[in-house]
C-alpha cells in the first residue's frame, strides 16, 4: 500500500506568500536611507561634527544608535526623538544644549545609554527621564546644573552609572536616588556641595564607588553613609573637611579605600575608623594633622597602604605613637612622612628624628607622651613641664619641675645608623674584591692568546737578562787571572788545577799552560 502526499496550499496561496516575503525583504532597504552629512553603518548613524543646529529628521525608525556629538544643537524639544523608538544609545555631548523640554526623550523605552555631557544645561524637568526605564548609563557631567528635582531620577531602576561631575550643585535632595536600586557608580565631584543630607544616598544599596572630591564639604559624619551597604571606594579628597566624626555605632564592613587627601583635617574622632574593619587603603596626605592617638592607629588593623605626608607633624614626644606604629607597619606609605615642627627637626623623616633626637624612650611600646620641652633663654637649661604619658591604658604622671642644667644639647650619634654604615662599607669592599676577581677570570677566558704572548715576551726578556749576567760574570773572572803560574821543572804533560777546575797541560817554554 503506497502513501500519497497532497500539498494543502493552492497556487494562489503560494503566490501570496511569495509576494509577502519579497515585501518584507524590501522594507529594511527602504528604511536605510542615511541622513545627509551622516555616516551610517547598518543601523548605527554617526552625525558628529557636521554643524547641525537641531536633531535631523529620522529616516530610519529602526536605527539602534545615533551620535550627534560636536554640533551646535541648542535645545531638545518635546518628542524630539519619537521617531527613534528603537534607539539603544544616544550621544549628544559637546553641543550647546541649554534647554531640555519635558518628555524630550519620550518613546525611547529601549535606550540604555544617554550622553549629555559638555553642554550648557542648567535645569532639567522632573519628567525628563521618566520613560527611560531601561537606561543603564547617564552622563550629565560638565554642565551648569545648580539643583536637581527630587524626582528627577524616579523610575531609573536599571541605572548603573551616573555622572554629575563638574556642575554647580550645592545640595543633594533627600531621597534623590531612592529609585536607583541598581546604581553602582556615582560621580558628584567638582561641584559646590557644602554638606550632605542624612538620607541623601538612601536607596543606593548596590553602590560600590562614590566620588565627592573637589567640593566644599567642611564636615563629614560617616553616619550619613549608613545606607551604602555595598560601598567599596569613597573619594573625599580636596574639600575643606576639618573634622571627621561618626554619629552612630555601626560597622561599615565593605569599605576598602578612603581618600581624604588635600583637606584641612585637624582632629579625628577616636572611634571613626573602628566602623571600617576592612579598610585597606587610607590616604590623608596634605592635611593639618600634628599627631595621631594610638587608639586611632590601632583600629587600622587591615591597612596595607597609608598616606600621611604633607601634614603638620610635631616631632616631639607627642609623635611617639605614630612613630611606633610606622615602625611596625607591614604595608607601605606613598610618600615620606616629614617633621614640620619644631624648627630643628623640620624636614627630617619622623623615624629618623625620633632616633636621632631620642624623642621616645621605647618604640616597642606604644607611648603617647604629653610632656613638652622648651628652651629657657634666661637660665640656659631645659625644663620639662609637668604632664603625663600613657603606656597602654595606664596614665603615669611625670615629675613636675625637673630641671637639667646644660649648656648645649647635641644629639648623640645613633648606634643603629653607625652599624648600618659599617655594614654598607664592608659590603662595598667585598663587592669590589669579587668584581676584580670576576674581571680577571673573564679576561683569562676571553683573551688567552694575548696572555700567552705576554708570558712568552716575559720569558724571552728574562732569558736575555740571564745571558747578559753570565757574560758579565765570565768577563770578571778572566780579569782576575784564572790560570796559575808555574815553574817547569820536568818535561812532559802534567796536571794543573786552576779556577776552572782540573786540566791536563803540556809543558811549554813559557809559563803558561795550554789545554
From Swiss-Prot:
Residues 1-33 form the signal peptide. It is found in: Cell membrane; Postsynaptic cell membrane. LRR repeats lie at residues 63-83, 86-107, 110-131, 134-155, 158-179, 182-203, 206-227, 230-251, 254-275, 278-299. Expressed in neuronal tissues. Residues 311-362 form the LRRCT domain. Residues 34-421 are extracellular. Keywords: Cell membrane, Glycoprotein, Leucine-rich repeat, Membrane, Postsynaptic cell membrane, Repeat, Signal, Synapse, Transmembrane, Transmembrane helix. One of its GO terms (cellular component) is GABA-ergic synapse. Residues 34-61 form the LRRNT domain. A motif (Involved in DLG4-binding) lies at residues 512-515. Residues 443-515 are cytoplasmic. SMART domains: LRR_TYP (SM00369). Glycans are attached at residues 57, 126, 243, 362. The chain crosses the membrane at residues 422-442. Belongs to the LRRTM family. Synaptogenic effects are mediated by the extracellular LRR region. Interacts with DLG4. Interacts with neurexin NRXN1; interaction is mediated by heparan sulfate glycan modification on neurexin. This is Leucine-rich repeat transmembrane neuronal protein 2. The lineage of its organism: Eukaryota, Metazoa, Chordata, Craniata, Vertebrata.
